[in-house]
Amino acid sequence: GNGTVVYPEFGGIAGENALAGIIFGCTSKLNVNLTIAPMKSRVGGIAGLNIGTISKCVSTGTIRVTQTNGNEYPVYVGGIAGEIQKFGGMGGVLKECLHAGKITVTAANNRVGQMCGTAADNVLSSSYGLSGHVLNCYGKSGEGNLVGGTDASIGTGGLLTEAQMKDSKSYVGWEFGTDWKISEDGLPERVENPEITSLEVKNNWTSCYVGEKPWYWGRLLINGTTYSEITADMISGFDSSAEGTTHVYVEYKGK
């Protein structure tokens, strides 16, 4: 007969982050212990499958995955995402993320990475390559590669020793003081309420069809030094029910 096969996707925050999805500023300390049936599977500390953007997220938990009798079926396991994919010319981005946990996989056909277990062919073969999709991301020395299943190079980020992880200077491209700080346990964490002295929207006008939303809202310049992507939850006053020009309001941390 006819049927649909749904591949399981597990994540500390979401099973799948779709093309328009942005997972921003999340920390997962979740310990995952999974026994998976023999079928293609994706497991990540933040998302099982990422087709959108995961930005400024930290995963510190332990991920244990076991698959028995699954020689023909791949298991993709990552500290942040099990797999990253593009759709058309967009998505599949991991930016400014850290994995500081441990990953253990028992499976005959597995791909494991501290950022993602695997990157889809359309990511590796894109004009930006892997370096354009995994940006300023860091993992722990001795715990495997950042991206599994490929020898493709990454231009930014890398693996850090325990001592380097506790040093803010190790995280090139991260804004400490306004956006990040080193926590009491020695790892980076987001600054919840930094003193905000100025906010500036950096974007030209954008457009969308009636009844839809723009896929990109622009960026905020915070205190004249730090950029942050504007996400849909920051927007108010948006109305696309009719043609015309509209102004929206952006709220960032109560400002």
Please name every model-derived segment.
Residues 205, 223-255:
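Serine/threonine-rich, repeat-prone extracellular segments and beta-strand-based repeat modules
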Residues 17-18, 209-214, 241:
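Short, low-complexity cationic-aromatic patches
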Residues 195-226:
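Solvent-exposed, low-complexity, repeat-rich "mucin-like" stalks and linkers
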Residues 108, 150-153, 168, 206, ...:
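N-terminal start and proteolytic maturation junction detector
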Residues 1-2, 199-201, 250-255:
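Short, intrinsically disordered, charge-balanced linker/junction segments flanking boundaries
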Residues 12, 45, 79, 203-207, ...:
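Short, recurring structural edge motifs at helix starts
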Residues 1-195:
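Predominantly extracellular beta-rich ligand-binding scaffolds that present long acidic/polar faces
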Residues 191-194, 221, 253-254:
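Secondary-structure transition/turn motif
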